Amino acid sequence: MSRIGKLPVKIPEKVKVSVDGNLVKVEGPKGKMSFPTNPRVKVAVDKGEVQVTRPDDSPESKGLHGLTRTLVKNALDGVVKGYERGLEINGVGFKAEVKGKEIHFALGFSHPVVFKLPEGVTAEVDAKQTKLTVKGVDKHVLGLTAAKIRALRPPEPYKGKGIKYAEEIIRRKEGKTGAA
């Protein structure tokens, strides 16, 4: 058995989990989400916990077993605690501003960049407008959103200008030494 997949997932208080065919629905205090599962694995809810089982020991089934259990665990954690990802904006005149469901960036281009946030994702900017925090219930959507924001102006290795993850370390390069 998969070491991760065979562990049952305890359902926290104030959380409802329902399985409808291959669709798992999770509702909690922070919000609700649903995601499809592969038909090769079965998800069952009983006695306050979620159990994931697989029909055989093929390599594909083993992989899907652990994956499905982790997706269920992430969904439960998301509706209880939520997820967040920090981004930092480095560069002279580079800043961000949240306006409703949009983030307006000044990233050194000749025009402002407007990024529309997907459903279920919120953003906050600090007072200096250089630290951005995106929050959401769905870990997958949150990661994709953070990656798309970073891709607007990836950090460059010479001066470190651009948008980077808060915990990311940029390997810096030396510039040209000049003609001798």
Swiss-Prot record:
A GO biological-process term: cytoplasmic translation
Keywords associated with the record: Ribonucleoprotein, Ribosomal protein, RNA-binding, rRNA-binding
Molecular function per GO: rRNA binding; structural constituent of ribosome
Database matches in InterPro entries: Ribosomal_uL6-like, Ribosomal_uL6-like_a/b-dom_sf, Ribosomal_uL6_a/b-dom, Ribosomal_uL6_bac-type, Ribosomal_uL6_CS
GO cellular component: cytosolic large ribosomal subunit
Any Pfam family: Ribosomal_L6
Subunit note: Part of the 50S ribosomal subunit.
Family assignment from sequence similarity: Belongs to the universal ribosomal protein uL6 family.
Functional description taken from the UniProt entry: This protein binds to the 23S rRNA, and is important in its secondary structure. It is located near the subunit interface in the base of the L7/L12 stalk, and near the tRNA binding site of the peptidyltransferase center.
Name the UniProt record assigns to this protein: Large ribosomal subunit protein uL6
Provenance organism: Anaeromyxobacter sp. (strain Fw109-5)
